[in-house]
Amino acid sequence: MEPKLRIIRKKKSEAENAHLDPLMRALKALHSAGAPESMTAEELERQRRSQEVLGKLTAPMTGMDYEEFALSGMSAAWTRLKAPHGSRHAILYCHGGGYTSGNLGYSRVLSSKLAHATGYDVLSFEYRLAPEFPYPAAVEDALRAWDYLMLQGYGARDIVLAGDSAGGNLALVLCNRLKTAGRKLPGTLILMSPWTDMTMSGQSYTERAEIDPMLTPEYIEAVRLAYAAGRDYRSSDLSPVSYTHLTLPTNPRV
């Protein structure tokens, strides 16, 4: 049985779109401070600080327990509801950040929201970041986090695998690695704006430039070079959009 794919779409009213324009401009100005055209050490540090600022714009929800621990040498954290729910399901959350930024502090906002929305325990982890640790370091770390859940007694079908942006890419690549190894896949995928194509061949960079303040061609080029310089961006471990063998449901929940 293949994992369930959940697609969430929300149409905005004209009033919401009108309000969104100044917000998008503000976000673009903030993000530009952390979206280097080249990946020097100074610019990379600036990008990571910017990512932390963006993550802290929304404080974690109350009613949560947050437990940090070491997972096979990397930092990880459980986010749980204070009120027990008794479920044996868990969410493995892969954070975004272009594979070059993001940490447990950044992850905490979305992991809290996922725990609150589902009632499930959420495991987040700090995978190694590029360019210090390029591909496949993040994939190896995601596999370690998956194996940790298996050792804790969770079944593959009990796991919801979630990821946003580069974390969505990582979630899909993890599924592909599990499938290739003949292992069971997670029961559900939750992908939020997943980065599925590193070839930069789509038209959305120009067609949606005014409403996407974050993902400029300069930013994408910088982070993909940091993560996988010299590699074939069409490969399945970099561009999951190329998958032909990882079959997802034909009737996903919307």
Kindly give the residue locations of the regions a language model identified:
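Single conserved hydrophobic/aromatic residue that forms the stacking wall/gate
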Residues: 245-254
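Alpha/beta-hydrolase superfamily serine-hydrolase fold, recognizing
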Residues: 34, 65-246
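Short alpha-helical segments used as structural interaction elements across diverse proteins
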Residues: 43-45, 221, 250
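A glycine/proline-hinged amphipathic helix-loop "lid/cap" segment
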Residues: 1-84
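Internal hydrophobic scaffold segments of catalytic domains
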Residues: 7-8, 194, 252-253
